[in-house]
């Protein structure tokens, strides 16, 4: 069994990372805590603490703009792309999710930003992409 700890972050797909960072820092007065490319996912991320959770700005870094974030923006426009909850055991969360009948995109944890193990629940199961 696993324990859900908190909402970890809200992933926001954006076309222009610098413009988005400027809004969150200069307009909302927040600070960026880290910027990281995750080439295996074709994305660059920036985390921005906001109270008890994080905002994660996501921009496509693939050559043709056809990574997951580029495809998301092409289909849906910019905006909330996923919500992430922190759990104490990612594999147990995957196993329980499958056991309860929800569809997983990932059947095993994979590497994410900040060295975290991540996995995604298919949005058809829960109404939004859930990490």
Predicted regions and their residues:
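Short glycine/proline-centered loop/turn elements that form peptide/ligand docking sites
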Residues: 19, 37-41
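Conserved active-site tyrosine of GNAT-family acetyltransferases
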Residues: 20-25, 97
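Vicinal oxygen chelate
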Residues: 1-3, 46-49, 56, 85, ...
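Short loop/beta submotifs within extracellular cysteine-rich repeat domains
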Residues: 20-22, 31, 53-57, 65-67, ...
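Helix-adjacent hinge/juxtasegments
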Residues: 56-81
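N-terminal beta-strand motif that seeds the catalytic metal site of vicinal oxygen chelate
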Residues: 1-18, 78-87
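Short secondary-structure junctions
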Residues: 29-37, 101-108
């Amino acid at each position: 069994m696993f324990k859900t700890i908190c909402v970890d972050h809200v992933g926001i797909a954006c076309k222009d990372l610098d413009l988005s960072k400027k809004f969150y820092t200069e307009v909302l007065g927040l600070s960026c805590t880290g910027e990281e490319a995750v080439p295996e996912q074709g994305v660059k991320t920036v985390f921005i603490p906001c109270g008890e959770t994080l905002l994660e700005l996501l921009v496509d870094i693939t050559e043709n703009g056809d990574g997951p974030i580029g495809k998301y923006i092409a289909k849906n426009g910019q905006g909330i792309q996923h919500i992430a909850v922190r759990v104490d055991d990612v594999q147990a969360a995957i196993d329980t999710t499958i056991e309860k009948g929800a569809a997983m995109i990932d059947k095993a944890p994979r590497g994410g930003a900040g060295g975290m193990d991540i996995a995604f629940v298919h949005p058809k199961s829960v109404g939004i992409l859930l990490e």
